[in-house]
């Protein structure tokens, strides 16, 4: 295989750049002499910071600009947080690598209180996620959920300024950026089921670029990929973008996958849950099965209501 340069399309946020640098280091470690450069760019989701994500359009909000760079041959691969990656790809592009997953749980961050349970009634909790909001309010309907956008540093600064009593963030992002000490407590997946793909990094590239596929192979983590495939299949069957109150989380039990799924009203009034097990080779079918269970319980009506409020399909 000839030595070549790989250009990585990435968003400019600190977390996105960390993920791109991680992939760069792994590629250079796996392939001596390979030149890897970053091509930072701004996504639509990065520009629109004054509105809840659910209101500004769900699918592909953080990836479209990166995909355009791949299609225009301005970059060779794009590095994404898997929870932001739409289910379908533009013609000529595909997902060819999923890296090993970091901690997939949600993190409770507060300067005053030790845990979600310790928050007094009426406490203000910051999150931009309808998934987190639905599960939080189902457990603690006495809390106030307040909109929170911006990068990790911005969100922590808003907490430190006293705008919130606590905020909920992905543990993976805090760990990767060196803010592990800011995690007051991690929230069990039993109490806050993660978003599909949360904590995993995916790599998208051109479908025809087989040399790139081969270079990415050492970074692919099969155990993570099988879990994420099941989660994404559930999301796809529910027509879920990254900004809907859908949660799903798969774990490996030997050669079996156990997938849990959840759809909730943002008010926390109704939470639908389902789970099933299947051989890991049937990951995609498992995702569809759990999604069908949720649909049978009435998930479609909840999701239609959310999409209607957001003003997009």
Swiss-Prot record:
Protein name: Porphobilinogen deaminase
UniProt cofactor(s): dipyrromethane
SUPFAM superfamilies from the UniProt entry: Periplasmic binding protein-like II, Porphobilinogen deaminase (hydroxymethylbilane synthase), C-terminal domain
GO MF, any single term: hydroxymethylbilane synthase activity
GO cellular component annotations of the record: cytoplasm
Note describing how the cofactor binds: Binds 1 dipyrromethane group covalently.
Reactions performed catalytically: 4 porphobilinogen + H2O = hydroxymethylbilane + 4 NH4(+)
Family named by the database record: Belongs to the HMBS family.
Note: The porphobilinogen subunits are added to the dipyrromethane group.
InterPro entries: HemC, Porphobilin_deaminase_cofac_BS, Porphobilin_deaminase_N, Porphobilinogen_deaminase_C, Porphobilinogen_deaminase_C_sf
One of the GO biological process terms: protoporphyrinogen IX biosynthetic process
UniProt entry keywords in alphabetical sequence: Porphyrin biosynthesis, Transferase
PANTHER family: PORPHOBILINOGEN DEAMINASE
CDD domains per UniProt: PBP2_EcHMBS_like
Pathway: Porphyrin-containing compound metabolism; protoporphyrin-IX biosynthesis; coproporphyrinogen-III from 5-aminolevulinate: step 2/4
Pfam families membership: Porphobil_deam, Porphobil_deamC
Function, in words: Tetrapolymerization of the monopyrrole PBG into the hydroxymethylbilane pre-uroporphyrinogen in several discrete steps.
Subunit structure: Monomer.
Signal peptide from the UniProt entry: none
UniProt EC number: 2.5.1.61
S-(dipyrrolylmethanemethyl)cysteine found at: 242
């Amino acid at each position: 295989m000839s030595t070549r340069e790989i250009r990585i399309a990435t968003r400019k946020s600190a977390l996105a750049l960390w993920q791109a640098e991680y992939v760069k280091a792994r590629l250079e470690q796996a392939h001596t002499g390979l030149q890897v450069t970053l091509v930072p760019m701004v996504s639509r989701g990065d520009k629109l910071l004054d509105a809840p994500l659910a209101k500004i359009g769900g699918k592909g909000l953080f990836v479209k600009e990166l995909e355009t760079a791949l299609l225009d041959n301005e970059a060779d691969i794009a590095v994404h947080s898997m929870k932001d990656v739409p289910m379908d790809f533009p013609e000529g592009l595909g997902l060819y690598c999923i890296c090993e997953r970091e901690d997939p749980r949600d993190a409770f961050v507060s300067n005053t209180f030790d845990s979600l349970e310790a928050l007094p009634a009426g406490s203000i909790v910051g999150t931009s996620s309808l998934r987190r909001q639905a599960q939080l309010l189902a457990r603690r309907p006495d809390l106030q959920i307040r909109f929170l956008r911006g990068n990790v540093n911005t969100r922590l600064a808003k907490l430190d300024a006293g705008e919130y009593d606590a905020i909920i963030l992905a543990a993976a992002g805090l760990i990767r950026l060196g803010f592990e000490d800011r995690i007051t407590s991690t929230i069990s997946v039993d109490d806050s089921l993660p978003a599909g793909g949360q904590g995993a990094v995916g790599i998208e590239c051109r479908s025809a670029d087989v040399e790139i596929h081969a270079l990415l192979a050492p970074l692919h983590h099969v155990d993570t990929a099988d879990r994420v495939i099941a989660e994404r299949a559930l999301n796809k069957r529910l027509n879920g973008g990254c900004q809907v109150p859908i949660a799903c989380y798969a774990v490996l039990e030997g050669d079996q996958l156990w997938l849990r799924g959840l759809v909730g009203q943002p008010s926390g009034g109704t939470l639908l849950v389902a789970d099933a097990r299947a051989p890991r080779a049937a990951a995609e079918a498992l995702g569809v099965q759990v999604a069908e269970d949720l649909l049978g319980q009435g998930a479609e009506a909840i999701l239609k209501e959310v999409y209607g409020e957001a003003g997009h399909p």
